[in-house]
Amino acid sequence: MNERVLRVLDFKSVTEMLKGQAETALGKERAKITKPLSSLDKINMLQDETDEAAKIIRLNQAIPLGGITDIRASVKRSSIGGILSTDECLDVANTLYGSRNVKNTIENMEELDIPILKELVEHITPIRELEQAIKSCIDDHGHIMDGASSQLRSIRSSIRTLESRIREKLENYTRSNSKMLSDAIITIRNDRYVLPVKQEYRGAIGGIVHDQSASGQTLFMEPKAVVDINNSLHESKSKEQLEIERILKDLSNQVASYEQDLLENVKVLTNIDFIYARGKLAQAMKASRPKMNDEGYMKMQQARHPMIPIDEVVANDIEFGREYTSIVITGPNTGGKTVTLKLVGLCTLMAQSGLQVPALDGCEMPVFDEVFADIGDEQSIEQNLSTFSSHMTNIVDIMKKITDRSLVLFDELGSGTDPQEGAALAMAILDEVISKQARVIATTHYPELKAYGYNREQVVNASVEFNVETLKPTYRLLIGVPGRSNAFDISTRLGLERATIERAKSLIGVDSKSVENMIASLEKSHLEAEQDYEQAHDVLLESEKLRNALEHEWNLFEQKKEKLYKKAEEKAEKAIQKAREEAETIVSEMRQMKDSAGLKEHEWIEARKMLDEAKPNLTKNGNQKQVDPKPVEDRQLQPGDEIKLLTVNQMGEVLERVSDKEYLVQVGIMKVKVKRKDLELIRKPKKKQVDPVTTIKGSNYHVSTELDLRGERYEDAILRLEKYVDDVLLAGYPKASIIHGKGTGALRKGVQEFVGRHPRIKGARPGESGEGGSGVTVIQLG
């Protein structure tokens, strides 16, 4: 895209707004050099990125970009052996933390469909070891900490001891020789502790003079008693500086070893901040994503000039590129024609830069190889040209470059010369541009061009509405209606005599009168059409409102139905839970039998399987499967009768009558109390001895040796873990693995606390490298 059009349309103002939305220096730098592209695929990719950022903002979420700085120069300097300062090292650590934070935040936005951003953060490499190495040596204020090395800790301990000894001796001087001192304080000169001694007591104190006051009355002396200690202190501070340099050298070498990863992280973070800034700008402008095309078709509803405040700007509908490829906006000067011209140009540049445009949803924007604009008189002064020559020089250059993939914007085409010649020249230029199949919008105040729009199929007239009552333009664009001067109406409103107005009208040609009357009629028809449209729009809104109300009622019905299903499911689950609770005591007995009486393992597992098979089968809607209940009379049921338990569709046998409405029946190995209405008599077999059975609390027959708790809430995870440990104990496994992930460590800590207090868990250890490392805890069962 040519630089001149970016300057003429003031595209820099847009990039400055974008720069203001970026949060890092890296993002601001990238925003500043934003340029329009001409590849449809690349533009669509940019629009996809912007749309993902806008989606995050719409859902009140955010990407945290705090603490991220431009560390590229520091990283490159470390790679050639340079020693970084403490602040530079701290910037590296903070940027590493910021990159890790950005990566985790975007990866955890599981409910959002943001594939581009999620793919981007896959290229961020967290370097915890380097981050921690720097943070363990340098505090948040950029100071090397004592714990940076054992040597530094020892040196600083020695320094503190020596400083204490020096202060103690000098404080003795201040107490015993206060009359010899200008002030009873201890100060420092040339990195040596000294006392402010009066000139006349120089010999009495004795020592080395390091400085004197401006008047010469006070000497800053180092008493002989502290010279040796000061020497030792100076030596220790030199050692301290050498050790600090060694530590910084070591940290710089570590930074250099991760050069490629760090530079890649910075590159990704820059792009993410740039994308996020585009999303925030879209929100600030109340913009929407344009559907891009390479057909030269533009359609914007309620489009707004991006540089005019939202509460002041007038929105307009603009569409061209199919039925007509050119728009000629006619009418008087100062009517807002140039604003419309720049609006189209700026929105085009924004869309091709991956920015959303300030218009309603559903807008469509074409992709142009070039946008050309002849607006204003920017060349005339600096090149000492007339207005006409300035415009024509630029137009000649444009005419040489335009193609069928160009957008051309002419402001006051043909102005600055004789009106008749200027109008003819304007029409000839438009014919040439249209013949090259370029898209063009031109503004003019020449009345001759009004007829031009009617005589060309590919051209449509337009005007900017003028309010005769207020004598001000409304800035509303009227497509299909050419502009008129309104001179007579304005003069009448301003008080010009009626006779003078009529005399003026009589002096203009018949053709001009006809054209003006036609335009007035068109304006009236256009206004009536708009009113009809608004009425139809109101009816449509009312219909949509009614439809929404019906949808709401339907949703309420669906919710009520779902609640009924849930109640049925809860009722069924309560029945299951009751049976399980009755089995709990027997489970305990069977555990004792297994430990003491040697219950066979296959019998134990078979019993558990049978109990699970007895669980009522629920459909996905939450209600029980339908059965055909056939209640039987009391006289039909006797101990030993073969029956069907209707609630679970299982065969069983009556053991005894508990009450008028309840029986004890055996289903498989399970004995349960069942209401009479839930039983169906099958037949009365021969009497047989019923072996005693035991019920147990069921679990799935196949119990996995691993339990994956990643992504679970803490409370839910512990409940699942408790049940799982019971299951693997019942299955007789010697060990099992609990997968909790590394994360923040909260879940891992909870798992370890549970394992530590469980009486049947003999021990636990972290997983080995092949087992998942610290993200897994392996438990030993007994």
Curated annotation (Swiss-Prot):
Superkingdom field: Bacteria
Gene3D superfamilies: 1.10.1420.10, 3.30.1370.110, P-loop containing nucleotide triphosphate hydrolases
CDD domains assigned: ABC_MutS2
GO-annotated biological processes: mismatch repair; negative regulation of DNA recombination; rescue of stalled ribosome
Keywords, comma-separated and alphabetical: ATP-binding, DNA-binding, Endonuclease, Hydrolase, Nuclease, Nucleotide-binding, RNA-binding, rRNA-binding
Binding-site list for ATP: 331-338
Pfam families xrefs: MSSS, MutS_V, Smr
Keyword Hydrolase: yes
Record-annotated Smr domain positions: 707-782
Function: Endonuclease that is involved in the suppression of homologous recombination and thus may have a key role in the control of bacterial genetic diversity.
Quaternary structure annotation from Swiss-Prot or TrEMBL: Homodimer. Binds to stalled ribosomes, contacting rRNA.
UniProt name for this protein: Endonuclease MutS2
